[in-house]
Amino acid sequence: MANIKSAKKRAVQSEKRRQHNASQRSMMRTYIKKVYAQVAAGEKSAAEAAFVEMQKVVDRMASKGLIHANKAANHKSKLAAQIKKLA
């Protein structure tokens, strides 16, 4: 455990940020899972609606640095291709 006051403060801040980031990541994954569920069910219109919401969340997380921009692009392109396959 840290002995210096500033190090103690940093440890507290780091833990608070870790918990916040974990909840944000969990929320993002939930949006992604919703799109996968709609695709698996074969519901194109519902999948497209969920995809639009998922895009917003994933882009926001990428802009904040929670995930890499390429990971965000990978999620979006992968799901867009799956939605496009639905007839």
Swiss-Prot record:
Q: Where is the composition biased (Basic residues)?
A: 1-11
Q: Record keywords: rRNA-binding included?
A: yes
| InterPro entries listed in its UniProt record | Ribosomal_bS20, Ribosomal_bS20_sf
Pfam families, A to Z:
Ribosomal_S20p
Report whether Protein transport shows up as a keyword of the record: no
Disordered: annotated segments: 1-27
Q: Which terms does the record give in the GO molecular function aspect? A: small ribosomal subunit rRNA binding; structural constituent of ribosome
Any one GO CC term of this protein is: small ribosomal subunit
Q: Which keywords describe this protein according to UniProt?
A: Ribonucleoprotein, Ribosomal protein, RNA-binding, rRNA-binding
Q: Name one GO biological process term.
A: translation
Q: Which HAMAP family match?
A: Ribosomal_bS20
> Which family, according to the similarity comment?
Belongs to the bacterial ribosomal protein bS20 family.
Q: Please give the function described in this protein's UniProt entry.
A: Binds directly to 16S ribosomal RNA.
> What's the protein called, per UniProt?
Small ribosomal subunit protein bS20
